[in-house]
């Protein structure tokens, strides 16, 4: 259980509650969650963040009417900057997108600008939005995370409660290495509903070599942990930086979609450019 799971800032969320589905545009449906909820317990404040990054959203169920009433469909790509005051709560995002369904817009650009304006207002930070026609995406191959997969280790695990203990003394040797490690076994639970969130994670670092067994045990310990996707990625980044002390570090997770949305947060303290192709489970 997260230390802020019952925080009053979460009381007003529609997540976990019965809601009506509106199909006429309503920006008030969007709800933000303060990033400070998970950053404060980690000792992180807006002026001392050890990373940069973004939350990348893919919008698969986006539709509206053109000026003549003909339905339009698109796939949306949203990048929400890490410095925003709030992250966007995903159920509210879904409800907000549903409100476009029976709303007329003159142009695709009007839709893009509307999304960008409303998301910026909710997040209180920088947001960029791109809309793709379906034929732009046809034939794109399923992507994969580059790196060494650490999942096929012959180890026994019987503890699935979150702990940072596995990262203590998880580095060895004085030689600096540079490697990229990948796991598809990341599973956490929604902060409010406790529904499972499934993801793949890529960890790039330069520093003393990290013990792969200990790293995998640490990642598996998220299995009963309740936090939003973005919060888990920041926690993982902060924990590895704290206990393993790499010179450079990048953490990037791509989660399976829910409600027509997938969330793909990344955090880094170096020059990192995330690949945005969807993975096999997305």
UniProtKB/Swiss-Prot annotation:
GO molecular function terms listed in the Swiss-Prot or TrEMBL record = preQ1 synthase activity
Q: Where in the cell is it found?
A: Cytoplasm
Q: Which reaction does it catalyse?
A: 7-aminomethyl-7-carbaguanine + 2 NADP(+) = 7-cyano-7-deazaguanine + 2 NADPH + 3 H(+)
Keyword Iron-sulfur listed? The answer is no
Residues of the active site:
190 (thioimide intermediate), 197 (proton donor)
Q: Which GO terms describe its cellular component?
A: cytoplasm
Pathway(s) annotated for this protein in UniProt:
tRNA modification; tRNA-queuosine biosynthesis
Q: Which UniProt keywords apply?
A: Cytoplasm, NADP, Oxidoreductase, Queuosine biosynthesis
Q: What InterPro entries does the annotation carry?
A: GTP-CH-I_C/QueF (IPR043133), NADPH_dep_7-cyano-7-deazaG_red (IPR050084), QueF (IPR029500), QueF_N (IPR029139), QueF_type2 (IPR016428)
Where, by residue number, does substrate bind?
88-90, 229-230
Amino acids binding NADPH: 90-91, 258-259
Query: What EC number(s) does the entry state?
Result: 1.7.1.13
Q: What Pfam families is this protein classified in?
A: QueF (PF14489), QueF_N (PF14819)
Q: Which GO biological process categories is it annotated with?
A: queuosine biosynthetic process; tRNA modification
Q: How does it assemble?
A: Homodimer.
Q: Please state which protein family the record places this protein in.
A: Belongs to the GTP cyclohydrolase I family. QueF type 2 subfamily.
Free-text function comment from the UniProt entry: Catalyzes the NADPH-dependent reduction of 7-cyano-7-deazaguanine (preQ0) to 7-aminomethyl-7-deazaguanine (preQ1).
Instruction: From the Swiss-Prot or TrEMBL record, give the protein name.
Output: NADPH-dependent 7-cyano-7-deazaguanine reductase
Which gene underlies this protein? queF
